[in-house]
């Protein structure tokens, strides 16, 4: 095991100064143990903002047959609340707009088990990016933490790592420039977190792939935002999982020529081979819009340059901003 920290606990405190640093500590820890003990292959399990890219950075540096397993999302409560609801209600209570008994009720029901924040926040964004990158098994990014699907994901990953060892398939065979472009495309189509930008730049650097801010702008000009997911949308990752996860979305993007189907994945097959038998979303679902009727026709992520950030900065367009 290595360390991890929760931004959910440290947000708004001095503790956030340690958050991004923890990513490097995690990567260094994985590299140190595996390098010292001579492991032939690695399965890394993560499930929060910084430990997921930390795992991938460590696996990239080691470049031994590897798989990432996402720990999974927290399921929303019976009243459709989650961790973020608690934060919002705490703010309402602080302003005198909510009774203490109502706040306590929300606190008691909203986080009923393990897992990462249930919307398209950083954890689910990075889980989706890693699946699109090819470093986790198909379906891993959307499964609930306590589900039978997640247990099967773990078992299947154990079988898959043997195949990777037999074929000597390493992260450098999977994490190519084209694979990172796939990950960026999927993140944009899902309306993912701005943190994906800084994490994917670091992940690419670790594996020796040249990736920069302009790649996000270039890809964003042709990639629509199609997912109605929290925080700017209405739905949770568990709802998307019930409708097929991100695989049908990736199939659509592949069919539209926005993904590189030739990229190798931890299944031992290419992305196109993994997606060949994936069925489209049901017509009556309203979580993922059609390609021709997106929420936004171009990326919600914006790369900015100016006197405050001469080397670049990232911003996110949310809600109905910039949709005209």
What is the role of each PLM region?
Residues 14-15, 19, 52, 58-64, ...:
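Catalytic or ion-coupling anion/metal-binding cores of large enzyme and transporter domains
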């Amino acid at each position: 095991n290595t360390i991890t920290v929760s931004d959910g606990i440290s947000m708004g405190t001095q503790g956030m100064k340690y958050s991004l640093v923890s990513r490097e500590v995690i990567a260094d820890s994985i590299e140190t143990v595996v390098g010292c003990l001579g492991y032939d292959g690695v399965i890394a399990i993560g499930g929060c903002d910084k430990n997921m890219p930390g795992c991938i950075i460590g696996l990239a540096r080691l470049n031994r047959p590897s798989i990432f397993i996402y720990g999974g999302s927290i399921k929303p409560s019976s009243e459709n609340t989650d961790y973020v609801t608690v934060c919002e209600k705490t703010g309402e209570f602080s302003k005198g707009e909510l009774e203490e008994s109502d706040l306590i009720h929300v606190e008691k029901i909203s986080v009923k088990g393990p897992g990462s924040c249930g919307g398209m926040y950083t954890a689910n964004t990075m889980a989706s990016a890693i699946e699109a990158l090819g470093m986790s098994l198909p379906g891993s990014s959307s499964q609930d933490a306590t589900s039978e699907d997640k247990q099967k994901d773990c078992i299947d990953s154990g079988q898959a790592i043997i195949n990777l060892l037999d074929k000597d398939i390493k992260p450098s065979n999977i994490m190519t420039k084209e694979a990172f472009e796939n990950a960026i495309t999927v993140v944009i189509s899902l309306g993912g977190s701005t943190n994906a930008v800084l994490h994917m730049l670091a992940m690419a650097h670790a594996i020796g792939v040249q990736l920069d801010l302009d790649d996000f702008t270039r890809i964003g000009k042709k990639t629509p935002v199609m997912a109605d997911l929290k925080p700017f949308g209405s739905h949770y990752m568990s709802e998307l999982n019930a409708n097929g996860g991100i695989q049908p979305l990736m199939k659509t993007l592949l069919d539209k020529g926005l993904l590189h189907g030739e990229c190798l994945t931890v299944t031992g097959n290419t992305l196109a081979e993994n997606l060949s038998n994936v069925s489209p979303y049901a017509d009556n679902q309203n979580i993922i819009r059609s390609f021709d009727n997106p929420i936004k026709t171009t990326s919600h992520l914006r790369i900015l340059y100016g006197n405050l950030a001469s080397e670049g900065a990232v911003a996110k367009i949310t809600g109905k901003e910039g949709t005209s």
